[in-house]
Structures are given as C-alpha cells and as structure tokens.
C-alpha cells in the first residue's frame, strides 16, 4: 500500500479508536526495537467523540484474574462450547448465560470486527452528583471581579440540576461561604498567613465529627454524617440557584487597604488548601472540580510566590537558571502536595488566570497537571478570550450531558511481546504492577494504571512501550504474529453512572531482521508528537541545551538508520515519503516555545507545555509547526504555503494558526490599499471579498478550539507582525543578501539557522555515521 493509502487507513483508525501509533508494525525482538530510535508509542484519546457508536447497557465480560482483559473482536469464540479464549493470556473462559443465543451470524456488538472501541454503562452509580467549588480572588479591580461574577452566574445555568456548588473567596483572608444559611450572608474565615493542615480545616468547618464548630458536644446528640455537615457549604444548583446568584452578586472587593508600593495580600495557597480539605472530608472518590479564578500572584501565607513589595519582581526564567529564587521551591512543594491530595481523592483543579503579569502558574501547574484540570492564561477576566473559553468548559453532548468525565482512570494490558514503559500526560501513577509493566521507564512509569481525575473528549495521553522478548520470534506459529494492547478507561459520566470505554489494538510483528514493513509502518506525525512529549518531560528536569542536544541526537540516529545514502556523501541522502516531514517537525520543535523559553515568562511556558500534553496528534502538530495559508487576487480561496519568510509577499494576505494565536497578516501593498479605502469603492468588490475571506476562515478555526486562541490582525512592518516572523523559517535574513528567496520576500533579522542549513548539517552528520 502506498503512503497516502496508509495515511488514510491510520486516519480511519484514529476516527474509530482515537489512537495513533508511532510504528504500525511492531518489531519482533528487543534488538530490532532498539534500532528504531523512536520508541513504540501511542497517542490515545480515550473519550474521542463517536456519535454513531452504541452505548452497551450491560456489564463487560472479563477474563479471569489476574488478566481481567475485556472480551473483544480479537478473542476466539467457540459458539457451540460457549467459551472464549482470551488473546492476552490464552485462558479459556465460559461465556455468561445471557450469551446463550449467539451464533456465527448473530454476535453481540463487542465481538463485531469494527468494535475495536466499545463503551459500557456500568451498573455502579456515582457516589455523589458532580461537584463544583468556585475559588474566587477578590483582590481585583471592580470590572474584573464583575466579569468573573457574571461568568459564574451564567455557568450555573449550564450545570446539571443536581450538581453541587460551593463558593470560597480569598484576599487577605480566605472565606468559605455557608450557602445553606439563608438568614444572612455567613462565612467561615481562615487567616491568610497560617498554614492549616487537613484536620484543622475540617474541624474549623465542623466536618471532622459532624458537629457545628463552637457548639458544646452534647453526649446524647447523635453524630451527624459528614455529608450532612458539608451540605451547608455545597448545595444543589436547582435548589439554591437563587442563593448562590445572590451571594455572587454581593461579592465585594477585598477591603484590606493596599499601599501604592505594595501588591495586594493574596492568600491563594490557603484558599486552595481549604477547598481541597472541604471536599476531602466528605467526597473522596466523588467527581469534583475546584475552579480557581486568580488575578495576581499569591503574596501571603503558604504557597506565596512573591513578596507584597512591588520593588521585588516575580521570578523569571533567568532567575530560575541562576537559582535566584527565594520562594519557588517552598511554593512548589506546597502546591505539589495539594495536587497529590486532590488527585488521590479524584478531584480536579482548574486554574483560570486573568492578569497581565504572572500569577504563579509555574508553581501551581501540577494542581492541573496531576488532576486533568484546565489551565487558562488570559490578560483579563473582562476579555472575550476568558469568557468564551470558560463557557466552553461546560459544553454538552446531544443528550444534554456535560462533555466531561470525572474521577477517571486508565489501565493498559498487553500481550507477552509488549510491555508498557510509561505515560506522559495529565495523570498520576496508581502504582499497579502487572505482567504488562516494562523494565525501563518513560514518563510516569513502573505501573500499568494511572488516575486522570478530569477527562474530556480532547484529553490525549502519550503511552510508551518496549518489546519484551530478547531473541527472534519464539515458537513459530502459522500466519503473521500479532502484538496486542488493550486500554480500559473507567470514568464517572455526568449522567451519574460509571462508564468503561475499551479500546483493543492489534498490530503485526515484523518478520526477520531488516523487514521493510517496519520502516513503511512509521507514522511521522504521531512520532513527532510522542517525541515532543518526551522532550517537554525532559525539559522539566534537565537544562534546555541538553534537551535540544537530545532532540538532535535522536533525529540524526533516525536518519542514519532509515535514509538511503552512500557513506560520507551528503548529496546522496534520500528519505522515504513517510519520513520526509519528520526532520522539519524537529526543526520547528527545537525553535518552539515548548523548548525555547526566551521571550516567554515561566507562567507562559507552564501553560504552553500543559496544553501540548493535553491535545491529540493534529492539534499538537499545529503547535509544533504552525499552518500558514495565503490569499491573493490571483487565486480563489486559500492556498497552504511554506512556513517560510519567502511566503511573505506584498500582494498577499497570510493566515497563521499557531493553535494559541490566529493571526491575519496583510502584505505591504494590500495594507496600503486597505488604508486608502479601496475596498469600499465601487469596482473593488474583489478586494473587499479578499479582505473578508481570511476573517471567515479564522472565525471557523476559533469556533471549535479550547482554549480560545488570541486573534491578531496586523500589517507588514507593524509591531504585532513579530508573532508571525518569530514562527517563520528564516530563509531570507540580513546575512543571506539577495540570494535567498525572492526580492519581494521579507528579511528576518535573526541569528537562528534556517531549515536549509539545518538539513545540510543533518545530512552531513547522518551519512558520516556519527551521532
């Protein structure tokens, strides 16, 4: 099959199963696997929307312990003997009684050849309805606070009627509002400068023993269950929408005076600690979201990231490199401990920042990364970017259920040929050992199961594997041999039931050494994203230059292994079609904001890396290598063009999509025409249409994206054009003179190497056989 045919096939599999593999044929020996350079890995999107797929209303049929694999199309079923043979452990299992009517022609949905992904609604109900605790910073300007209040009031109408809602506000103090008390506004106040442990939080809120705080403990009084106690702070939306709306509307700015040379006292750490403690006491392993809305950095109490003195700037990447960080390590330790507690309880923490300066996302990032929460970084809560992104969190499916899963976990099973080495994505390890766990570690390893807590239809995970057997194929069996993996995703659906989604993947094992099917099975797009995740994972612990060297080394080794060339002759270097884009993906990854921190704040770096680790192959590739489309009067519609400075032409409009930004760039001549107002004159309708077309395309891109990208319209020579110039391959720089690119293309002032220079060096090193 040619490359285009294979791409279509992989695309069909992605639509059906939500999975892309770096290699679609598995090497048959560990030796062969080590020569592949790029690890065997999968980008898996467990909740990928499949509107036409049935939801099975019965329990899955599973293999005996310890295997526990779920019945799937690859199982051998003996209809007459009513048994099935598990393809993972080869054990024989009886079919349950209700399968008595199956025949060769009438089989249940889970055995249908195309049912490689199937979803079950389990009988187990959720322990509680979905819970949302809003944690709101009151140290902000009135218009900003009003925007948050309006967004929260609007979100109440989007929640399921039985959802429980709580409210915590914080400034100099943290206040837990007792929504169940209707006589007047009543709240429990925590000092912003004090570090409370879980027991103290629960005692102060009267949750520890089910009695009200400051009440004598009457021996004859029965102890109320903790759920009843927490119900004072968490009320169902349908019952308390009026009270909650009232409470939100009455929220005022923090009254504590702030001097001109000081930052407001903001106890973000205490507020989050109280929120985690409140849910921990009564709702362990119940689906919940803690949503933080902060408009500045924590300046008081545990988790503070900068002092209240304005003369002291918040830490930069430069400070971190020089270890000039006063509060960083202590704050990181505090928030990481909170994140682990939240993840263990199955609770999600979402971080929404509305501030031009940094708010301390770098320190808080694992609250979202460990729990599958959202991170949203915006300049202000009054911006449409925040308002529209926040509402999209509550998107619903056709049955009016929220498109979010709670309290999720993922388990991976493999046949004996494969072992799982780890996962890179928003999850924590469940420390589950099995025969499927590999010896090496890539990402979060030494386990075959992870807890994700929050999961949505675009949550994607990089899962990495190794080959188990040492030699060639063991017992020679007739026909091609297969390696298999099964992904089991348990999650609490917003309808109130637990669901299980099962995806089973089988791929052929390669033949003897040098089998050409291995190279043909390489999916360069999935491989680039899997390697980008490893790069970002390394960048969190290693120095930037070391990570770039690793990216280069792996690329040179891959090209040495799979390119056609004569030794020491760079001009003879050729790559097969399914490898040709991989070097340029790596070129753009090296220059991207994921690995280059220059010009970004630590908070921005944390945000960008968070989003990369959440998206599927298609969206991740846009982040790594943005798309560029050109519009001109010479052709209809848009034309994809190279992400290159030579693509800038005076009579063209460019549309750049970096995932985080959507930018419309008017060439010099077009900008002059527009400023002269030609498009409003008779006879220039085609110019008006040309100016409108990229806006329509941009609107379409923005309409289906989360978080909402920043929309920029700029002209050649304008200051905003820097967003475009920083992404382009600098083929025409101040050093190339008149030789590189056309006369009319843009000169970029940079010392970065161009893609051509990068490729020349790559070929030279690859053919020399040294990495």
Curated annotation (Swiss-Prot):
Membrane topology, from the record: Peripheral membrane protein
Gene3D superfamilies: beta-sandwich domain of Sec23/24 (2.60.40.1670), Sec23/Sec24 helical domain (1.20.120.730), Severin (3.40.20.10), von Willebrand factor, type A domain (3.40.50.410), Zn-finger domain of Sec23/24 (2.30.30.380)
MF term (GO), any: zinc ion binding
GO cellular component terms, semicolon-separated: COPII vesicle coat; cytoplasm; endoplasmic reticulum exit site; endoplasmic reticulum membrane; Golgi membrane
GO biological process: COPII-coated vesicle cargo loading; intracellular protein transport
Record flagged with keyword Endoplasmic reticulum: yes
Signal sequence, start to end: none
Alphabetized UniProt keyword annotations: Cytoplasm, Cytoplasmic vesicle, Endoplasmic reticulum, ER-Golgi transport, Golgi apparatus, Membrane, Metal-binding, Protein transport, Transport, Zinc
Chain sites annotated for binding Zn(2+): 63, 67, 86, 89
Protein location: Cytoplasm; Cytoplasmic vesicle, COPII-coated vesicle membrane; Endoplasmic reticulum membrane; Golgi apparatus membrane
Primary localisation category: cytoplasm
UniProt key word Chaperone: no
Similarity annotation: Belongs to the SEC23/SEC24 family. SEC23 subfamily.
Job of this protein: Component of the coat protein complex II (COPII) which promotes the formation of transport vesicles from the endoplasmic reticulum (ER). The coat has two main functions, the physical deformation of the endoplasmic reticulum membrane into vesicles and the selection of cargo molecules.
Subunit structure: The COPII coat is composed of at least 5 proteins: the sec23/24 complex, the sec13/31 complex, and the protein sar1.
Protein name, UniProt field: Protein transport protein sec23
